[in-house]
A protein has these predicted regions:
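Leu/Val/Ala/Ile-rich N-terminal alpha-helices, chiefly Sec-type signal peptides and the beginnings
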Residues: 19-126
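Short, charged/polar, low-complexity loop and linker segments
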Residues: 49-67, 88-89, 99, 125-133, ...
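Structured alpha-helical bundle/scaffold domains in large eukaryotic membrane-trafficking regulators
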Residues: 91-98, 124-127, 131, 161, ...
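N-terminal amphipathic/basic-hydrophobic helices that include classical n-h-c signal peptides
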Residues: 1-26
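Non-transmembrane, amphipathic alpha-helical segments
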Residues: 43, 60, 64-78, 96-107, ...
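C-terminal accessory extensions/subdomains outside the catalytic/core fold
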Residues: 19, 23-37, 244-298
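Charged, amphipathic alpha-helical oligomerization/scaffolding segments
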Residues: 71-74, 78-81, 85, 103, ...
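Long, charged all-alpha helical bundle/coiled-coil segments in cytosolic proteins
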Residues: 101-181
Length: 298
């Protein structure tokens, strides 16, 4: 038996009305129950629970850590910029008089100390009572650049490479008075990895310094740098495997720098009796141009 269209539509409307009435009654009962439990409030799906309170606390903690990470990262960038300026200033030493050399090294020493007492100390204060390994990636680039500048300055003063213990000592800030003597001193964590990568960067600066010394007839300094680079290369080879992908690329640059210094010293030994000292740098530049032109283009 067929049901008329009007009757079928009437039944549908009746069902819809019943559903609306049922939902309305359910909502009314829910609101009444919420008012009895929490007067003046209305229950909702976002009602606070203990679990949600915990997640809100976790969110605040993460926001604080992210903000601190960003501040440390910005300070690290400033350390990188200022350390590069110190390195560039010391690269101007070849050809200067002894008095000018001492003045420039003194200025560089003051700049390094200022970096330590301002930017790096700010990083140490940010990391007080924090796990430094959670933030080490934020300041590793600046720390490596600072170690490169410090080791370059130390080499020009003493002819040796600064030790890891010395770097950590310079970045440990003790208490200012006796009342704070019992407090744990502030410090920037210098992992062996950062120290090794920073010293690896030094080899490129020593190579540039050596080539500049050739044109100023400071031949003894060239041979000294060559000997130091050879000793460093042997030390790096003795390290074995180090879980740092950056070290592989730095070692490639290290080998290239050592090769250039050895070639410069070899050419210097052969030609210093034939070519004036002020022309040797032009000779080396000519050789470099010939080698670069002979390399096939990929």
């Amino acid at each position: 038996m067929l049901i008329p269209v009007e009757q079928n539509q009437s039944r549908k409307n009746s069902l819809v009305q019943r559903l609306v009435l049922l939902v309305s009654q359910t909502m009314t009962e829910a609101v009444s129950a919420a008012k009895e439990v929490l007067p003046g409030t209305i229950a909702s799906p976002s009602q606070d629970t203990v679990l949600m309170d915990l997640f809100r606390e976790y969110s605040k903690t993460l926001d604080k850590k992210n903000d601190k990470y960003e501040r440390v990262y910005k300070a690290s960038r400033d350390v990188t910029v200022r350390s590069k300026r110190v390195i560039f200033s010391m690269q101007r030493i070849p050809g200067l008089s002894e008095e000018e050399r001492e003045t420039l090294l003194g200025t560089a020493s003051g700049d390094l100390r200022d970096i330590e007492q301002t930017l790096l100390k700010h990083i140490a204060m940010e990391l007080r009572d924090e796990d430094p390994y959670q933030f080490v990636n934020a300041y590793t680039a600046g720390l490596q650049e600072y170690i490169e500048a410090l080791s370059f300055h130390h080499f020009l003063l003493t002819g040796s490479i600064v030790s890891h213990e010395e770097v950590q000592r310079r970045l440990t800030y003790g208490p200012q008075d006796e009342a704070q003597a019992a407090l744990v001193p502030l410090s920037v964590l210098v992992r062996p990895k950062e120290y090794i990568l920073g010293v690896a960067d030094l080899t490129g600066e020593l190579m540039r310094f050596c080539i500049k010394c050739v044109s100023t007839a400071d031949f003894d300094k060239c041979y000294q740098i060559c000997g130091v680079l050879k000793a460093m290369h042997g030390g790096f080879l003795s390290l074995g495997y180090i879980p740092a992908k950056e070290l592989y690329h730095k070692m490639m640059v290290f080998k290239s720098s050592l090769h250039k210094v050895e070639e410069a010293c070899y050419s210097l030994q052969l030609r210093k009796s034939e070519v004036p000292a002020d022309m040797l740098s032009d000779v080396f530049a000519m050789y470099d141009a010939e080698e670069n032109s002979s390399v096939p283009l990929l």
